[in-house]
C-alpha cells in the first residue's frame, strides 16, 4: 500500500493508544480504564482525542498523502474508538492462518512488554480466540468500514487484492 502515491506507510504508531487514555492496551490499570471510559462517553473529550491524534499524524505527513496506514497490531482492540473519533477512517483487517499467526508470535522474541501473552502457548491460544471474537463483533457492527483481507489470498493474488484495496 505504501508504494501508492496517496498512501503513507507510517509503520506501527502508538498515537491511538495515547489518545485512548488506556496506557497499557493489553493490561490497562483502573486509571487507564477510567480514562478510556471518559474518552468514549464524552463528546468533548472524544473530539479532543481526535484533534490530538490528527495533530500527531500531521507531523508524519510530509508528502500530503490522502491516507496514512498505521499497522500497530493492537489497534484491533480500539476499533470502536477509531470509529468514534475517526468515522471517515477505513480499516484493513489482515486475517492470517491461525497456526501461522500464533507460531510467528510464539517464535519471535519481542523487546517490548506488550506481547508477553505470546510466550506461553495456552495464553497465546486464548488471546488469539479473544482477538477473533472481538474482530467478529467489529466486523458485524462496522462491516462497511472494515476490509477483511485474507493474507493467503493476498500472497496468491497480490495485484487483484491490491486493486480492491485502492
Question: For the regions a protein language model found, what residue spans apply to each?
Answer:
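Generic alpha-helical segment signature
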Residues: 42-50
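A conserved segment at the C-terminal end of the G1
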Residues: 1-8
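Short beta-strand-centered segment that lines the nucleotide-binding/catalytic pocket of NTP-utilizing
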Residues: 8-20
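PAPS-dependent sulfotransferase catalytic domain
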Residues: 19-43, 62-166
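Switch/coupling sub-region of P-loop NTPases
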Residues: 50-55, 70
Amino acid at each position: 500500500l505504501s508504494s501508492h502515491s496517496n498512501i503513507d506507510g507510517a509503520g506501527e504508531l502508538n498515537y491511538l493508544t495515547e489518545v485512548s487514555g488506556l496506557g497499557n492496551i493489553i493490561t490497562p490499570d483502573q486509571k487507564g480504564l477510567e480514562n478510556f471510559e471518559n474518552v468514549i462517553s464524552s463528546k468533548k473529550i472524544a473530539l479532543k482525542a481526535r484533534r490530538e491524534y490528527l495533530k500527531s499524524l500531521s507531523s508524519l505527513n510530509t508528502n500530503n498523502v490522502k491516507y496514512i496506514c498505521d499497522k500497530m497490531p493492537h489497534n484491533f482492540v480500539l476499533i470502536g474508538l477509531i470509529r468514534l473519533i475517526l468515522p471517515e477512517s477505513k480499516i484493513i483487517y489482515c486475517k492470517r492462518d491461525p497456526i501461522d499467526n500464533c507460531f510467528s508470535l510464539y517464535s519471535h522474541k519481542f523487546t517490548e512488554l506488550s506481547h508477553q501473552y505470546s510466550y506461553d502457548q495456552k495464553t497465546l491460544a486464548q488471546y488469539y480466540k479473544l482477538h477473533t471474537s472481538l474482530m467478529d463483533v467489529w466486523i458485524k457492527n462496522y462491516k462497511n468500514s472494515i476490509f477483511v483481507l485474507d493474507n493467503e489470498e493476498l500472497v496468491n493474488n497480490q495485484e487483484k487484492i491490491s486493486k480492491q484495496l485502492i
